[in-house]
Amino acid sequence: MAVLVHITSIENEAAIKRAGIKPGYRNVVFFMPHMKDCFISHQWARELKRFGIKNFAAVDFKIPDDEEIWFGKYHLQHEKMELNKAISLFMNAEDKLGYEFFIDRKIEPREIIKIRKIPKPMGWRYQPHAHGKKPCPCPRCLQAGGYKTKKLKVSQ
């Protein structure tokens, strides 16, 4: 069984210890395989910061290798497959940025190994490889009240 990591707010620590990780956005639990390269394992933390999380925690857990999970690149079609197959595809990918793993069930407290504080969020913002590219000015991509949103709308 591989060790997996779910990034959340440190404020959820007590609830997670008591009741496990409950499905949130889209009724799923997002996670990544735990790797030596923290940038890859924690790549979603910086994106989560945009939604108001200030202090982060990494929840390490294990689920059976043959469990069905969803896997794919951000904003692309995801496939349902066994965890071990998804991890194998991920580990062999040339570019590991932007991949998502999620499961459509609760992670039970007995499956949790440990919860640890992450010192600061790392990873990409908006989308992988966005650094140095101008943001898309379409209304779907621009968030109301976002950084330089007004300026981007005027420059269209």
Question: What label would you give each PLM region?
Answer:
Residues 24-27, 36-156:
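Conserved NAD+-utilizing ADP-ribose enzyme module
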Residues 1-30, 37, 44:
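ADP-ribose/NAD+-binding catalytic cleft of ART/PARP-like enzymes
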